[in-house]
Amino acid sequence: MSTPPLPDELRRVHMVGIGGAGMSGIARILLDRGAMVSGSDAKESRAVVALRARGAAIRIGHDASSLDLLPGGPTAVVTTHAAIPKTNPELVEARRRAIPIVLRPVVLAKLMAGHTTLMVTGTHGKTTTTSMLIVALQHCGFDPSFAVGGDLGEAGTNAHHGSGECFVAEADESDGSLLEYTPDVAVVTNIEADHLDFFGSAEAYTAVFDAFVERLTPGGALIACVDDPGSAALAERTAALGVRVLRYGSAGGRDLAGALVGWEQQGTGAVAHIQLAGESAPRAMRLSVPGRHMALNALGALLAALQVGADPDTVLDGLAGFEGVRRRFELVGTATGVRVFDDYAHHPTEVAATLAALRAVTDQAGDGRAVVVFQPHLYSRTETFAREFGAALSAADLVFVLDVYGAREQPIAGVSGASIVEHVGVPVTYVPDFSAVAAQVAGAVRPGDVVVTMGAGDVTMLGPEIIAALQARANRTVPGAGAR
Protein backbone atom coordinates (compact mmCIF):
# COMPACT_ATOMS: atom_id res chain seq x y z
CA MET A 1 0.00 0.00 0.00
CA SER A 2 0.99 3.63 -0.33
CA THR A 3 1.65 4.95 3.17
CA PRO A 4 0.02 8.31 3.87
CA PRO A 5 2.56 11.10 4.35
CA LEU A 6 3.51 12.01 7.89
CA PRO A 7 1.63 14.99 9.32
CA ASP A 8 3.89 18.04 9.45
CA GLU A 9 3.87 18.05 13.26
CA LEU A 10 5.40 14.55 13.31
CA ARG A 11 8.37 15.35 11.10
CA ARG A 12 10.47 16.75 13.97
CA VAL A 13 9.63 15.04 17.28
CA HIS A 14 11.21 15.11 20.72
CA MET A 15 10.28 12.17 22.96
CA VAL A 16 10.56 12.36 26.75
CA GLY A 17 11.08 8.86 28.12
CA ILE A 18 12.07 7.50 24.71
CA GLY A 19 13.51 4.25 26.08
CA GLY A 20 10.23 2.91 27.45
CA ALA A 21 8.49 -0.06 25.84
CA GLY A 22 5.73 2.00 24.27
CA MET A 23 7.71 5.12 23.45
CA SER A 24 10.62 3.31 21.81
CA GLY A 25 8.20 1.56 19.47
CA ILE A 26 6.70 4.85 18.34
CA ALA A 27 10.22 6.22 17.80
CA ARG A 28 11.11 3.24 15.57
CA ILE A 29 8.09 3.81 13.34
CA LEU A 30 8.68 7.56 13.14
CA LEU A 31 12.30 7.00 12.11
CA ASP A 32 11.29 4.39 9.54
CA ARG A 33 8.84 6.88 8.05
CA GLY A 34 11.46 9.58 7.71
CA ALA A 35 10.90 11.70 10.80
CA MET A 36 13.73 13.39 12.69
CA VAL A 37 13.58 12.13 16.27
CA SER A 38 15.31 13.27 19.44
CA GLY A 39 14.67 12.09 22.95
CA SER A 40 15.74 11.66 26.53
CA ASP A 41 15.59 8.94 29.12
CA ALA A 42 16.70 8.40 32.68
CA LYS A 43 19.17 5.64 31.78
CA GLU A 44 20.87 3.81 28.96
CA SER A 45 19.09 0.71 27.68
CA ARG A 46 19.03 -1.68 24.75
CA ALA A 47 16.19 0.36 23.26
CA VAL A 48 18.16 3.61 23.51
CA VAL A 49 21.21 2.06 21.86
CA ALA A 50 19.08 0.63 19.04
CA LEU A 51 17.34 3.95 18.41
CA ARG A 52 20.64 5.83 18.28
CA ALA A 53 21.81 3.34 15.65
CA ARG A 54 18.73 4.25 13.60
CA GLY A 55 19.56 7.96 13.77
CA ALA A 56 17.78 9.28 16.86
CA ALA A 57 19.58 11.94 18.92
CA ILE A 58 19.18 10.82 22.54
CA ARG A 59 20.48 12.30 25.79
CA ILE A 60 20.58 10.46 29.11
CA GLY A 61 19.04 12.58 31.84
CA HIS A 62 16.42 15.29 31.53
CA ASP A 63 17.32 18.89 30.74
CA ALA A 64 15.55 21.78 29.02
CA SER A 65 18.33 22.03 26.42
CA SER A 66 17.42 18.58 25.09
CA LEU A 67 14.69 20.24 23.04
CA ASP A 68 17.50 21.57 20.83
CA LEU A 69 19.12 18.21 19.98
CA LEU A 70 17.75 18.16 16.43
CA PRO A 71 19.78 20.09 13.85
CA GLY A 72 18.24 22.53 11.42
CA GLY A 73 15.49 24.09 13.46
CA PRO A 74 13.11 23.76 16.40
CA THR A 75 11.25 20.69 17.58
CA ALA A 76 7.71 20.66 16.18
CA VAL A 77 6.10 18.57 18.90
CA VAL A 78 7.05 16.96 22.20
CA THR A 79 5.56 13.58 23.02
CA THR A 80 5.62 11.75 26.32
CA HIS A 81 3.63 9.23 28.33
CA ALA A 82 1.37 9.50 31.34
CA ALA A 83 3.98 8.35 33.87
CA ILE A 84 6.28 11.34 33.16
CA PRO A 85 5.53 14.15 35.65
CA LYS A 86 4.48 17.54 34.34
CA THR A 87 7.39 19.02 36.28
CA ASN A 88 9.90 17.32 33.98
CA PRO A 89 12.24 20.15 32.84
CA GLU A 90 11.76 19.33 29.16
CA LEU A 91 7.99 19.52 29.47
CA VAL A 92 8.30 22.76 31.42
CA GLU A 93 10.51 24.19 28.66
CA ALA A 94 8.14 22.99 25.95
CA ARG A 95 5.27 24.84 27.61
CA ARG A 96 7.43 27.96 27.93
CA ARG A 97 8.18 27.82 24.19
CA ALA A 98 4.55 26.99 23.34
CA ILE A 99 5.62 23.71 21.70
CA PRO A 100 2.66 21.30 21.60
CA ILE A 101 2.90 18.37 24.04
CA VAL A 102 0.99 15.22 23.12
CA LEU A 103 0.80 11.80 24.73
CA ARG A 104 2.02 8.63 23.02
CA PRO A 105 -1.48 7.34 22.09
CA VAL A 106 -2.19 10.52 20.12
CA VAL A 107 0.94 9.95 18.03
CA LEU A 108 0.14 6.27 17.54
CA ALA A 109 -3.37 7.13 16.36
CA LYS A 110 -1.91 9.50 13.75
CA LEU A 111 0.53 6.81 12.58
CA MET A 112 -2.33 4.33 12.12
CA ALA A 113 -4.30 6.69 9.88
CA GLY A 114 -5.01 5.17 6.47
CA HIS A 115 -4.50 1.58 7.66
CA THR A 116 -6.89 -1.22 8.56
CA THR A 117 -6.38 -1.23 12.31
CA LEU A 118 -6.54 -4.30 14.53
CA MET A 119 -6.21 -3.56 18.24
CA VAL A 120 -5.99 -5.81 21.27
CA THR A 121 -6.88 -4.75 24.79
CA GLY A 122 -7.88 -6.31 28.10
CA THR A 123 -6.65 -6.54 31.65
CA HIS A 124 -4.40 -9.52 30.94
CA GLY A 125 -2.84 -11.11 27.88
CA LYS A 126 -2.96 -8.18 25.48
CA THR A 127 0.76 -8.07 24.72
CA THR A 128 0.92 -11.79 23.97
CA THR A 129 -2.29 -11.80 21.93
CA THR A 130 -1.15 -8.77 19.93
CA SER A 131 2.18 -10.46 19.27
CA MET A 132 0.52 -13.70 18.18
CA LEU A 133 -1.62 -11.75 15.73
CA ILE A 134 1.43 -9.97 14.32
CA VAL A 135 3.35 -13.21 13.82
CA ALA A 136 0.31 -14.88 12.21
CA LEU A 137 -0.15 -12.05 9.72
CA GLN A 138 3.56 -11.95 8.94
CA HIS A 139 3.47 -15.67 8.24
CA CYS A 140 0.59 -15.02 5.82
CA GLY A 141 2.71 -12.47 3.94
CA PHE A 142 0.80 -9.39 5.10
CA ASP A 143 3.83 -7.39 6.44
CA PRO A 144 1.72 -5.41 8.93
CA SER A 145 2.90 -2.32 10.73
CA PHE A 146 2.75 -2.89 14.46
CA ALA A 147 3.34 -1.46 17.92
CA VAL A 148 3.29 -3.75 20.92
CA GLY A 149 4.30 -3.55 24.59
CA GLY A 150 7.01 -6.21 24.44
CA ASP A 151 9.73 -7.49 22.13
CA LEU A 152 8.63 -10.30 19.82
CA GLY A 153 10.92 -13.31 20.11
CA GLU A 154 11.05 -13.75 16.33
CA ALA A 155 11.55 -10.12 15.37
CA GLY A 156 13.41 -8.92 18.46
CA THR A 157 11.56 -5.62 18.28
CA ASN A 158 8.41 -3.99 19.61
CA ALA A 159 7.44 -2.01 16.49
CA HIS A 160 7.73 -2.04 12.72
CA HIS A 161 6.65 0.07 9.76
CA GLY A 162 5.37 -2.47 7.24
CA SER A 163 4.35 -2.30 3.61
CA GLY A 164 0.94 -3.89 4.17
CA GLU A 165 -2.47 -2.34 4.74
CA CYS A 166 -2.86 -3.63 8.31
CA PHE A 167 -1.66 -1.95 11.48
CA VAL A 168 -1.72 -4.11 14.62
CA ALA A 169 -1.38 -2.45 18.01
CA GLU A 170 -1.84 -3.08 21.69
CA ALA A 171 -4.31 -0.67 23.30
CA ASP A 172 -3.30 0.10 26.88
CA GLU A 173 -6.31 0.68 29.10
CA SER A 174 -4.41 1.66 32.25
CA ASP A 175 -4.95 5.43 31.86
CA GLY A 176 -7.95 5.51 29.53
CA SER A 177 -5.80 6.48 26.55
CA LEU A 178 -7.23 3.70 24.38
CA LEU A 179 -10.05 6.13 23.64
CA GLU A 180 -7.73 7.88 21.18
CA TYR A 181 -8.17 4.98 18.74
CA THR A 182 -10.82 4.05 16.16
CA PRO A 183 -10.15 0.37 15.40
CA ASP A 184 -11.61 -1.72 12.62
CA VAL A 185 -11.20 -4.89 14.69
CA ALA A 186 -10.96 -4.92 18.48
CA VAL A 187 -9.98 -7.98 20.52
CA VAL A 188 -10.84 -7.89 24.24
CA THR A 189 -9.19 -10.71 26.17
CA ASN A 190 -10.75 -10.07 29.58
CA ILE A 191 -11.91 -7.32 31.92
CA GLU A 192 -11.11 -7.45 35.62
CA ALA A 193 -10.74 -4.56 38.05
CA ASP A 194 -7.24 -3.05 37.88
CA HIS A 195 -5.53 0.34 37.86
CA LEU A 196 -7.96 1.56 40.49
CA ASP A 197 -5.41 4.20 41.49
CA PHE A 198 -6.34 5.92 38.20
CA PHE A 199 -9.99 4.95 37.66
CA GLY A 200 -11.18 5.07 41.26
CA SER A 201 -13.69 2.23 40.91
CA ALA A 202 -14.23 -1.06 39.10
CA GLU A 203 -17.26 0.47 37.37
CA ALA A 204 -15.20 3.31 35.90
CA TYR A 205 -12.55 0.83 34.76
CA THR A 206 -15.14 -1.34 32.99
CA ALA A 207 -16.78 1.67 31.37
CA VAL A 208 -13.62 2.55 29.43
CA PHE A 209 -13.92 -0.73 27.49
CA ASP A 210 -17.50 0.09 26.51
CA ALA A 211 -16.37 3.50 25.31
CA PHE A 212 -13.54 1.88 23.36
CA VAL A 213 -15.71 -0.57 21.41
CA GLU A 214 -18.19 2.20 20.68
CA ARG A 215 -15.34 3.78 18.69
CA LEU A 216 -15.18 0.84 16.26
CA THR A 217 -15.46 1.96 12.66
CA PRO A 218 -18.77 1.24 10.85
CA GLY A 219 -18.79 -2.44 9.97
CA GLY A 220 -16.06 -3.16 12.50
CA ALA A 221 -16.03 -6.16 14.82
CA LEU A 222 -15.50 -6.90 18.48
CA ILE A 223 -13.80 -10.23 19.23
CA ALA A 224 -14.40 -11.10 22.88
CA CYS A 225 -13.34 -14.00 25.12
CA VAL A 226 -16.51 -15.18 26.83
CA ASP A 227 -14.68 -17.43 29.29
CA ASP A 228 -14.11 -14.17 31.16
CA PRO A 229 -17.26 -12.72 32.79
CA GLY A 230 -16.25 -9.11 32.17
CA SER A 231 -15.50 -9.63 28.51
CA ALA A 232 -18.64 -11.76 28.06
CA ALA A 233 -20.79 -8.99 29.53
CA LEU A 234 -19.13 -6.46 27.22
CA ALA A 235 -19.97 -8.71 24.26
CA GLU A 236 -23.64 -8.72 25.26
CA ARG A 237 -23.79 -4.95 25.68
CA THR A 238 -21.97 -4.38 22.40
CA ALA A 239 -24.19 -6.77 20.43
CA ALA A 240 -27.22 -4.91 21.77
CA LEU A 241 -25.86 -1.80 20.04
CA GLY A 242 -25.93 -3.59 16.68
CA VAL A 243 -22.16 -4.01 16.50
CA ARG A 244 -20.85 -7.25 15.01
CA VAL A 245 -19.52 -9.45 17.83
CA LEU A 246 -17.46 -12.64 17.52
CA ARG A 247 -17.20 -14.66 20.71
CA TYR A 248 -14.50 -17.18 21.56
CA GLY A 249 -13.75 -19.42 24.51
CA SER A 250 -14.70 -22.78 25.95
CA ALA A 251 -17.93 -21.75 27.67
CA GLY A 252 -20.79 -24.05 26.66
CA GLY A 253 -24.13 -22.91 25.30
CA ARG A 254 -22.67 -19.95 23.43
CA ASP A 255 -22.73 -19.01 19.77
CA LEU A 256 -18.96 -19.14 19.43
CA ALA A 257 -16.96 -18.04 16.40
CA GLY A 258 -14.11 -20.07 17.86
CA ALA A 259 -14.30 -22.72 20.58
CA LEU A 260 -11.46 -24.24 22.58
CA VAL A 261 -12.72 -27.82 22.84
CA GLY A 262 -9.55 -29.38 24.24
CA TRP A 263 -6.03 -28.59 25.35
CA GLU A 264 -3.00 -30.75 26.14
CA GLN A 265 0.33 -29.71 27.59
CA GLN A 266 3.35 -31.00 25.65
CA GLY A 267 6.63 -30.09 27.33
CA THR A 268 6.81 -26.31 27.36
CA GLY A 269 4.25 -26.13 24.54
CA ALA A 270 0.73 -27.36 23.92
CA VAL A 271 -1.74 -28.70 21.40
CA ALA A 272 -5.18 -27.08 21.45
CA HIS A 273 -8.20 -28.45 19.65
CA ILE A 274 -10.40 -25.69 18.30
CA GLN A 275 -13.70 -25.55 16.46
CA LEU A 276 -14.33 -22.64 14.09
CA ALA A 277 -17.91 -21.66 13.32
CA GLY A 278 -19.12 -23.14 10.04
CA GLU A 279 -16.54 -25.91 9.97
CA SER A 280 -17.53 -29.56 10.37
CA ALA A 281 -14.49 -30.79 12.30
CA PRO A 282 -12.11 -29.42 14.93
CA ARG A 283 -8.62 -28.27 14.01
CA ALA A 284 -5.36 -28.86 15.88
CA MET A 285 -3.59 -25.66 16.97
CA ARG A 286 0.01 -26.33 18.01
CA LEU A 287 1.77 -23.83 20.25
CA SER A 288 5.33 -23.47 21.51
CA VAL A 289 4.19 -21.64 24.67
CA PRO A 290 2.55 -23.34 27.66
CA GLY A 291 -0.76 -22.75 29.39
CA ARG A 292 -4.45 -22.85 28.61
CA HIS A 293 -4.54 -19.05 28.74
CA MET A 294 -2.05 -19.01 25.86
CA ALA A 295 -4.37 -21.23 23.81
CA LEU A 296 -7.20 -18.75 24.37
CA ASN A 297 -4.92 -15.86 23.39
CA ALA A 298 -4.00 -17.70 20.18
CA LEU A 299 -7.65 -18.37 19.38
CA GLY A 300 -8.45 -14.66 19.69
CA ALA A 301 -5.50 -13.82 17.43
CA LEU A 302 -6.67 -16.39 14.86
CA LEU A 303 -10.16 -14.90 14.71
CA ALA A 304 -8.73 -11.39 14.28
CA ALA A 305 -6.49 -12.54 11.43
CA LEU A 306 -9.46 -14.13 9.68
CA GLN A 307 -11.24 -10.76 9.68
CA VAL A 308 -8.67 -9.35 7.24
CA GLY A 309 -8.69 -12.33 4.90
CA ALA A 310 -5.90 -14.48 6.30
CA ASP A 311 -5.95 -18.19 5.45
CA PRO A 312 -6.68 -20.24 8.61
CA ASP A 313 -4.19 -23.02 7.79
CA THR A 314 -1.41 -20.49 7.24
CA VAL A 315 -2.34 -18.64 10.43
CA LEU A 316 -2.12 -21.89 12.41
CA ASP A 317 1.30 -22.58 10.89
CA GLY A 318 2.42 -19.14 12.02
CA LEU A 319 1.07 -19.61 15.54
CA ALA A 320 2.91 -22.93 15.83
CA GLY A 321 6.17 -21.03 15.36
CA PHE A 322 5.35 -18.25 17.82
CA GLU A 323 8.28 -18.16 20.25
CA GLY A 324 6.70 -15.89 22.82
CA VAL A 325 7.26 -12.34 24.00
CA ARG A 326 10.07 -11.15 26.20
CA ARG A 327 9.14 -11.55 29.87
CA ARG A 328 6.10 -13.76 29.13
CA PHE A 329 7.15 -17.13 30.56
CA GLU A 330 10.54 -16.55 28.96
CA LEU A 331 13.26 -19.13 29.57
CA VAL A 332 16.25 -17.32 31.05
CA GLY A 333 18.50 -20.35 31.33
CA THR A 334 19.34 -23.60 33.10
CA ALA A 335 21.95 -24.41 35.75
CA THR A 336 22.52 -27.54 37.87
CA GLY A 337 19.32 -29.07 36.54
CA VAL A 338 17.19 -26.06 37.51
CA ARG A 339 15.32 -24.17 34.80
CA VAL A 340 14.71 -20.45 35.39
CA PHE A 341 11.92 -18.54 33.67
CA ASP A 342 10.88 -14.89 33.84
CA ASP A 343 7.33 -13.56 33.64
CA TYR A 344 5.64 -10.15 33.73
CA ALA A 345 2.58 -11.29 35.75
CA HIS A 346 1.65 -8.61 38.29
CA HIS A 347 -2.09 -9.15 38.92
CA PRO A 348 -3.54 -12.12 40.84
CA THR A 349 -5.27 -13.53 37.76
CA GLU A 350 -2.05 -13.31 35.74
CA VAL A 351 -0.11 -14.95 38.57
CA ALA A 352 -2.64 -17.81 38.70
CA ALA A 353 -2.48 -18.34 34.92
CA THR A 354 1.31 -18.35 34.85
CA LEU A 355 1.50 -20.76 37.78
CA ALA A 356 -0.98 -23.09 36.07
CA ALA A 357 1.39 -23.19 33.10
CA LEU A 358 4.38 -23.63 35.41
CA ARG A 359 2.63 -26.47 37.23
CA ALA A 360 1.91 -28.21 33.93
CA VAL A 361 5.62 -28.01 33.06
CA THR A 362 6.78 -29.39 36.43
CA ASP A 363 4.16 -32.15 36.41
CA GLN A 364 5.42 -33.36 33.03
CA ALA A 365 9.06 -33.09 34.05
CA GLY A 366 8.70 -35.42 37.06
CA ASP A 367 9.14 -34.63 40.73
CA GLY A 368 10.54 -31.11 40.39
CA ARG A 369 8.96 -28.29 42.35
CA ALA A 370 7.37 -25.07 41.13
CA VAL A 371 9.31 -22.22 42.77
CA VAL A 372 8.16 -18.60 42.51
CA VAL A 373 10.11 -15.42 43.19
CA PHE A 374 7.40 -12.74 43.27
CA GLN A 375 7.85 -8.98 43.43
CA PRO A 376 4.61 -7.05 44.07
CA HIS A 377 4.13 -4.07 41.75
CA LEU A 378 2.58 -0.87 43.16
CA TYR A 379 1.58 -0.27 46.77
CA SER A 380 -2.04 0.39 45.82
CA ARG A 381 -2.33 -2.92 43.96
CA THR A 382 -0.66 -4.79 46.83
CA GLU A 383 -3.03 -3.24 49.35
CA THR A 384 -6.10 -4.06 47.24
CA PHE A 385 -5.17 -7.61 46.26
CA ALA A 386 -2.91 -8.93 49.07
CA ARG A 387 -5.26 -11.80 49.89
CA GLU A 388 -5.78 -12.67 46.20
CA PHE A 389 -2.03 -12.64 45.53
CA GLY A 390 -1.52 -15.00 48.46
CA ALA A 391 -4.14 -17.40 47.15
CA ALA A 392 -2.69 -17.37 43.63
CA LEU A 393 0.87 -17.92 44.84
CA SER A 394 -0.29 -20.90 46.88
CA ALA A 395 -0.40 -22.93 43.66
CA ALA A 396 3.41 -23.11 43.84
CA ASP A 397 5.46 -25.45 46.01
CA LEU A 398 7.85 -22.82 47.32
CA VAL A 399 7.48 -19.03 47.29
CA PHE A 400 9.82 -16.11 47.83
CA VAL A 401 8.14 -12.70 48.17
CA LEU A 402 10.16 -9.53 47.67
CA ASP A 403 9.28 -6.05 48.80
CA VAL A 404 7.01 -3.84 46.70
CA TYR A 405 8.32 -2.24 43.51
CA GLY A 406 6.67 1.15 43.90
CA ALA A 407 7.26 2.52 40.37
CA ARG A 408 5.32 5.79 40.20
CA GLU A 409 3.80 5.50 43.70
CA GLN A 410 4.85 6.63 47.15
CA PRO A 411 4.81 3.99 49.92
CA ILE A 412 1.57 3.33 51.79
CA ALA A 413 1.91 2.85 55.55
CA GLY A 414 1.62 -0.80 56.53
CA VAL A 415 1.83 -2.12 52.96
CA SER A 416 4.79 -4.29 51.94
CA GLY A 417 5.57 -7.71 50.58
CA ALA A 418 4.79 -9.03 54.05
CA SER A 419 1.16 -8.06 53.44
CA ILE A 420 1.01 -10.90 50.90
CA VAL A 421 3.11 -13.43 52.80
CA GLU A 422 0.51 -13.90 55.54
CA HIS A 423 -1.99 -15.15 52.93
CA VAL A 424 0.29 -17.69 51.21
CA GLY A 425 -0.65 -21.27 52.04
CA VAL A 426 2.63 -23.00 51.08
CA PRO A 427 6.21 -22.58 52.36
CA VAL A 428 7.06 -18.92 51.84
CA THR A 429 9.97 -16.63 52.64
CA TYR A 430 9.83 -12.84 52.74
CA VAL A 431 13.07 -11.35 51.37
CA PRO A 432 12.99 -7.54 51.61
CA ASP A 433 16.71 -7.29 50.78
CA PHE A 434 16.85 -7.47 46.96
CA SER A 435 20.57 -8.19 46.98
CA ALA A 436 20.04 -11.35 49.05
CA VAL A 437 17.37 -12.97 46.88
CA ALA A 438 19.50 -14.86 44.34
CA ALA A 439 21.63 -16.56 46.99
CA GLN A 440 18.59 -17.55 49.06
CA VAL A 441 16.81 -19.04 46.06
CA ALA A 442 19.92 -20.88 44.88
CA GLY A 443 20.34 -22.37 48.34
CA ALA A 444 16.76 -23.62 48.48
CA VAL A 445 16.25 -25.26 45.08
CA ARG A 446 17.35 -28.69 43.87
CA PRO A 447 17.81 -30.36 40.46
CA GLY A 448 14.50 -30.73 38.62
CA ASP A 449 12.95 -27.62 40.14
CA VAL A 450 11.55 -24.92 37.88
CA VAL A 451 11.89 -21.31 39.05
CA VAL A 452 9.96 -18.32 37.74
CA THR A 453 10.79 -14.73 38.64
CA MET A 454 7.57 -12.79 38.44
CA GLY A 455 6.47 -9.16 38.46
CA ALA A 456 6.49 -5.93 36.47
CA GLY A 457 9.50 -4.37 38.21
CA ASP A 458 13.22 -5.06 38.37
CA VAL A 459 12.68 -8.65 39.51
CA THR A 460 13.53 -9.47 35.88
CA MET A 461 17.19 -8.84 36.78
CA LEU A 462 17.20 -11.80 39.16
CA GLY A 463 16.99 -14.64 36.62
CA PRO A 464 20.63 -14.35 35.48
CA GLU A 465 21.71 -13.74 39.09
CA ILE A 466 19.99 -16.94 40.27
CA ILE A 467 21.67 -18.92 37.48
CA ALA A 468 25.05 -17.44 38.41
CA ALA A 469 24.46 -18.27 42.09
CA LEU A 470 23.54 -21.86 41.21
CA GLN A 471 26.69 -22.23 39.12
CA ALA A 472 28.81 -20.75 41.91
CA ARG A 473 27.37 -23.21 44.44
CA ALA A 474 28.03 -26.10 42.06
CA ASN A 475 31.64 -25.01 41.61
CA ARG A 476 32.17 -24.88 45.37
CA THR A 477 30.99 -28.48 45.74
CA VAL A 478 33.47 -29.81 43.17
CA PRO A 479 36.91 -30.52 44.71
CA GLY A 480 39.50 -28.26 43.15
CA ALA A 481 36.91 -26.24 41.21
CA GLY A 482 38.32 -22.88 40.28
CA ALA A 483 41.91 -23.90 41.15
CA ARG A 484 44.68 -22.57 38.94
From Swiss-Prot:
Top-level taxonomic group: Bacteria
Localization per Swiss-Prot or TrEMBL: Cytoplasm
UniProt-annotated binding residues for ATP: G122, T123, H124, G125, K126, T127, T128
Keywords: ATP-binding, Cell cycle, Cell division, Cell shape, Cell wall biogenesis/degradation, Cytoplasm, Ligase, Nucleotide-binding, Peptidoglycan synthesis
Its EC number(s): 6.3.2.8
GO BP field: cell division; cell wall organization; peptidoglycan biosynthetic process; regulation of cell shape
GO molecular function: ATP binding; UDP-N-acetylmuramate-L-alanine ligase activity
InterPro entries per record: Mur-like_cat_sf, Mur_ligase_C, Mur_ligase_C_dom_sf, Mur_ligase_cen, Mur_ligase_N, MurCDEF_pg_biosynth, UDP-N-AcMur_Ala_ligase_MurC
Pfam families given in the database record: Mur_ligase, Mur_ligase_C, Mur_ligase_M
This protein's pathway: Cell wall biogenesis; peptidoglycan biosynthesis
Reaction(s) catalysed (UniProt annotation): UDP-N-acetyl-alpha-D-muramate + L-alanine + ATP = UDP-N-acetyl-alpha-D-muramoyl-L-alanine + ADP + phosphate + H(+)
Record-level GO cellular component terms: cytoplasm
Keyword Metal-binding: no
Enzyme class per UniProt: ligase
Similarity comment: family membership: Belongs to the MurCDEF family.
HAMAP family per UniProt: MurC
Described function: Cell wall formation.
Full protein name: UDP-N-acetylmuramate--L-alanine ligase
Organism expressing this protein natively: Mycobacterium sp. (strain KMS)
Organism phylogeny: Bacteria, Bacillati, Actinomycetota, Actinomycetes, Mycobacteriales
Gene name in the database record: murC
